[in-house]
Amino acid sequence: IKAALESKLFDKVVVSTDDEKIASVAKSFGAEVPFLRDKSLADDFTGTFAVVKDAYQKLKDSFSSLDTVCCIYATAPLLKAKHLQEAYNLMQNAHAKSVISICEFPFPIQRAFVKDDNGNLSYREPKFAPMRSQDLQKCYQDCGLFYFYDKSCFEYAKDYQSIGYAMPRHRVIDIDTPEDWDYACAMAKAVEELKLD
């Protein structure tokens, strides 16, 4: 919420949740919660796009112009306003329909191993085994921090091209457990003390 507000990109910062307590906390930090999310969209199996599309459908009539939507995950504590600004500018300059926050894999995925039932390792892609890691193509992953969407993604585009905004690795943490949260706190402190940005 803080990064979104500080970015000055958004007319409104809206939180989609099915939980009254979360709604209350979101409001206390300056977000709006004009509706509670339908329970059918609040399980562990519903994809992000369905949730964002639902929010877009509910909000589009209350805006004079709702051209771009940004979904920011609640589990992105190291996200800064400048990342949102840079990603939005990238989207505008590239005339893209969508921007995904990405980060480079820390190791070449072409040299990944798989284990069989006995624990024996084999290369997932053996043809890359003899190659130097610096000669392999860089690969990126969706780092699950934020997504920008043009409104056409919700209204009529079934297939749209996305471009990636590469986040610094020290700003990317996937928070699923209390240990992940502790790691995020330690990383935030390190980023601040070492002035990594």
Where on the chain are the PLM-derived regions?
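Short, high-confidence coil segments that cap the C-terminus of an alpha-helix
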Residues: 10, 64-66, 93-96, 191
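Conserved core of the sugar-phosphate nucleotidyltransferase
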Residues: 47-50, 68, 77-169
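Short beta-strand scaffold positions
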Residues: 16-17, 148, 175
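Short beta-strand/turn micro-motifs composed of small residues
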Residues: 17-18, 73, 102
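Short phosphate-binding loop-to-helix
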Residues: 14, 20-70, 78-82, 86
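N-terminal glycine-rich phosphate-binding loop and ensuing alpha1 helix
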Residues: 1-16
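Hydrophobic helical membrane-anchoring modules
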Residues: 166, 170-197
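Short, structured coil segments at secondary-structure junctions
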Residues: 9, 29-31, 117
